[in-house]
Every structure is written in C-alpha cells, then in structure tokens.
Design a protein with these regions (language model features):
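N-terminal nucleic-acid-engaging modules of covalent nucleotidyltransferase systems
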Residues: 1-137
Length: 137
C-alpha cells in the first residue's frame, strides 16, 4: 500500500484527468480522503494555529506509525467537534505535534498543508468529485 504522499505525488505527475481519477480510486483510503477533505472542504475548519509548528520530523524509513493509523486523531483538531472544542489548546497542539512527528515526514508536510487549507497539487474539486463523489462540499 502506498503512503498518502506517494499517491498524491503520482496524481500531481499525471497529465490526464482520467489517470488522476484512476490513481485516486485505486489507492482509496480513509487517510487519503481525510487529507483531501481537510484541505479542500471549506466546512472543515481547524482548531490549530496556522503555519508550521516546531517539530522534529521522523526518519521516513523508521517512522513509528503511519497516517493510515493516525488520521483517526484528526477529530481532535476540527472546530465544532466536541473532542476538539473541549480539549485544552496546549494539549491539542501537543497531540498534533506528536502525530506529525510519528508519521513519514512527507505525510507530515501534507497534514501541515491540510490544516493551512492548502490543497494538494494536481487536485481540483471536479476531479475529486469524480473520484470520490460528495467528499468535498
């Protein structure tokens, strides 16, 4: 299974829309869809400061965990979700830093871009709608 950043790199390098849709569909995962939704859906607002927090990226080949596991923690960072709104901001930011330090550094860059609402290169709303209907509002 490809890491999320590998899938999105492949999409970015593809020229044809049908190839991009095929790549997304073949590599469908909740982690991939969460990154896309969190980056592109305006109804998702993050309960974290903008920019990039100070963190120590993991060594890619030795990352202790993966985005496939850690994406489940995104609920602690979304505004309007009780798990996030009820959490102490320092604890929330500490949890976020732990998440990005534990995953592959390229996936960590995607997560940071996501909370800053920077959409992955090569993706458009119509493309995402074709691959994953209804994912992005």
């Amino acid at each position: 299974m490809k890491l999320v950043y590998e899938v999105l790199d492949e999409v970015k390098k593809s020229r044809k829309k049908e190839d991009k849709v095929r790549i997304l569909k073949e590599n469908e995962s909740w982690a991939l869809k969460d990154i896309i939704k969190g980056s592109m859906d305006e109804s998702v607002q993050w309960n974290l400061p903008g920019g990039s927090p100070p963190y120590n990226p993991s060594e890619g080949h030795n990352a202790p965990t993966s985005l496939f596991r850690e994406h489940k923690k995104f609920k602690y960072f979304v505004k309007g979700v009780p798990a996030s709104d009820g959490m102490n901001p320092i604890k929330r930011e500490s949890l976020f830093i732990g998440l990005i330090e534990g995953i592959h550094p390229e996936d960590a860059k995607l997560v940071i871009a996501m909370i800053n609402k920077t959409k992955p290169a090569g993706l458009t709303k119509p493309l995402v709608d074709e691959a994953f209907p209804g994912l992005v509002k």
